[in-house]
Amino acid sequence: MELYAAGRYDSEPFKMNEHDIIQLYGEDVQYVKNAFLSSDSTCNNNVYSLEEHELDDDKKNLSGVLVEYKIKISLLQSSDGVKHLFFCTNPKSVDIARMLEIPEGKDKTRVYFMMPLLVLCLGLSATFSGLNLAIMSFSINDLKLIQESDSDKLMKQRAMDVMRLRRNSNFVLVTIIFGNCFCNISITLLMNYFAEFYGFGGFIFVELISTALLLIFTEILPSLIFTKNALAIASRLQYFVIFTMCITSPISYPLAMLLNIILGKENADDSAPLDLDALQIDELEDEEAADGNNFHEMMSVVKKTIKLREKLASDVMTEIDKVGMYSEHQQVTHSFLLDAYEQGHSRLPVYEGETRNKIRGVLNITDMMLLMDDEGRGSDTDLTLGTMLSVLEKRRKHCFVLDTMPVEHFMSELQQGCPMAIVVRYKEVDSEEDGTEIYEVCGIVTLEDCIEEILGEIFDEKDARQE
């Protein structure tokens, strides 16, 4: 940069860059004591003293006298705009000092704001990636099994919290992915800003750093942290997810509705049955059976227990033709008690009159113990089963169920002491006439019948009759 030229003066200012060096040369350069920058052209206001720069060996061998001055532009830059200063020497070399243009400086306060913003974006990106793993790693069947069978109340509550989010699974998924993409793009832009501000690299360098940060914070850390405590973290961050859904709803909600139309909505209704195929119990059973342990039997019981939810009363009932039933007019005689005892009957269904469709109640064999003598022998009496039902009113506690009713709907009645459930089936009739029964008794269901569906055959009074 030649500031001293005999008989010449250029009115345009020199535009200074960070690494520019001012060179002075000429016959009288050796008389220059120092150089400085002034805010006015008269060189009366010294704002920055220049430091003489040591010459390279090549420049020392040049003919003539040469002096170099180096300017630290960063010390003179201002974020308010371009600054103009005048180069001056002592003593002056020309009547009019030469103007230098200092480019606009960078606002460091913005950097102090951008750094916390970068940390926030990294944290949010990791959170969104982790939530995607935590919430979507549990299937609807997994959550329902935890709600219904887990003994830990806290785990049940956490499963309920996550199930609340899964009712809008597409909306939640789009929200999480949108938030993750937004944070990742922001991280890349911020890294590019820092690279330009500090001047530490080009496009490839910025991409490498951004890729490394995203790999660590959005892939590795979420996989290590969120997968170990997925249900607990997803439950605790449910309100954060809901808040994010509200903020991003103008974009994420229409996309979620579009996914519902194209792919369908996930069935997260609490009343929906478990999808047994999704549980893959058969695969687990086959894998563990090769180990020769008891896992096969345990998984078989689990599978039968779950399938019991799908069965109807007609699937587990004992058909009425195989049930020992007695008329209300049957006298309680010695032979009757002996016959009932030998056949292994513990519960005696009593019907009204001559029709087996009108069940009056169910007597327990223990009720007959009142008529036994001290030696266990029955005595002939004039009592009938109908009379005993009238006396023992509590033994009339039984329930009627339709043959199409699911087993789980009347299991609680059997557990609470109901001796048996009478299964009825409605007849197909054109019109209902007076005194015409529109239903028929087709079987009975006891608690033992339900247990047999789970554990297999149990030796009970039905098997005693077959023996």
Curated annotation (Swiss-Prot):
InterPro entries: ACDP, CBS_dom_sf, CNNM, Ion_transp-like_CBS
Keyword terms of this UniProt record: CBS domain, Cell membrane, Glycoprotein, Ion transport, Membrane, Repeat, Transmembrane, Transmembrane helix, Transport
Protein's GO biological process: determination of adult lifespan; magnesium ion homeostasis; monoatomic ion transport; positive regulation of gonad development
Gene3D superfamilies: CBS-domain
Cell compartments where the protein resides: Cell membrane
Pfam families, alphabetized: CNNM
Phenotype seen when the gene is deleted: No visible phenotype. Quintuple knockout with cnnm-1, cnnm-2, cnnm-3 and cnnm-5 results in a reduced lifespan and 100% sterility.
Residues bearing attached sugar chains per UniProt: N61, N364
Membrane topology type: Multi-pass membrane protein
Membrane-traversing stretches: 111-131, 171-191, 197-217, 239-259
Residue ranges, Cytoplasmic side: 132-170, 218-238
SUPFAM superfamilies on file: CBS-domain pair
Keyword Repeat attributed: yes
The keyword Disulfide bond belongs to this UniProt entry's keyword annotation: no
Extracellular side: 1-110, 192-196, 260-467
A single cellular component GO annotation: plasma membrane
Source species, domain of life: Eukaryota
Ranges where the CBS domain occurs: 317-381, 394-461
GO molecular function: transmembrane transporter activity
Domain CNNM transmembrane: 107-293
Family of this protein: Belongs to the ACDP family.
The protein's role, per its UniProt record: Probable metal transporter. Probably acts redundantly with the other metal transport proteins cnnm-1, cnnm-2, cnnm-3 and cnnm-5 to regulate Mg(2+) homeostasis.
UniProt-recorded name of the protein: Metal transporter cnnm-4
Gene source species: Caenorhabditis elegans
